[in-house]
Amino acid sequence: MAAIAASEVLVDSAEEGSLAAAAELAAQKREQRLRKFRELHLMRNEARKLNHQEVVEEDKRLKLPANWEAKKARLEWELKEEEKKKECAARGEDYEKVKLLEISAEDAERWERKKKRKNPDLGFSDYAAAQLRQYHRLTKQIKPDMETYERLREKHGEEFFPTSNSLLHGTHVPSTEEIDRMVIDLEKQIEKRDKYSRRRPYNDDADIDYINERNAKFNKKAERFYGKYTAEIKQNLERGTAV
């Protein structure tokens, strides 16, 4: 009887130990899941915070002027230049000479070539600047008519050089040659403008494989890139021998 009782005690203790181990294992797994859940929760909050910051920054960028990045870069460059000038002045050095030491020979040659150009294209900034550049280009093409100048000066005498009391406005009548020259120049400008925005003429004999103009442009683009790969398939479809 004593042996049986001892064996039952051992079995009970073993069962209790296994139950305790199982409970401890379950607690560890639950703790791992909770820790993983907390990590995911923190990651979600961090992602939400970053997304909100990105949305705010994008909204700020959209509200800024179109050329804000270029202006900002220009201002930063000017600030750096001012700081360098102050540093050189504090050291008693000539800023222009110090700046030349930092410029390579290739950059110096390129800069000199750019300075020698009569009407350099500095890139698009706004429509007013583009119009001003065109105005300078057109005025430089005007050739003075010295014969007409001398004739008008002899005709008007001292009044040819106007003062605050002169009343020459509306008295000049352009000649036929001047009007023709202006018309020719305007026609050249219109022709040049049409080359930049040339609309292709409509071909009545061309195959219609589109439903609207946008689809026609897409089909032309697809034909340009994939036409050589689909030529045989199109021919088989037209002959009726496609598999």
Swiss-Prot record:
Modification type N-acetylalanine: residues: A2
Keyword field contains Flavoprotein: no
Alphabetized InterPro entries for the sequence: mRNA_splic_SYF2 (IPR013260)
GO CC, alphabetical: catalytic step 2 spliceosome; nuclear speck; nucleoplasm; nucleus; post-mRNA release spliceosomal complex; Prp19 complex; U2-type catalytic step 2 spliceosome
Predominant subcellular localization, coarse grouping: nucleus
Subcellular location: Nucleus
Function: Involved in pre-mRNA splicing as component of the spliceosome.
Family: Belongs to the SYF2 family.
Assembly and interaction partners: Identified in the spliceosome C complex. Interacts with CCNDBP1.
The protein's name in its UniProt record: Pre-mRNA-splicing factor SYF2
Protein species of origin: Homo sapiens
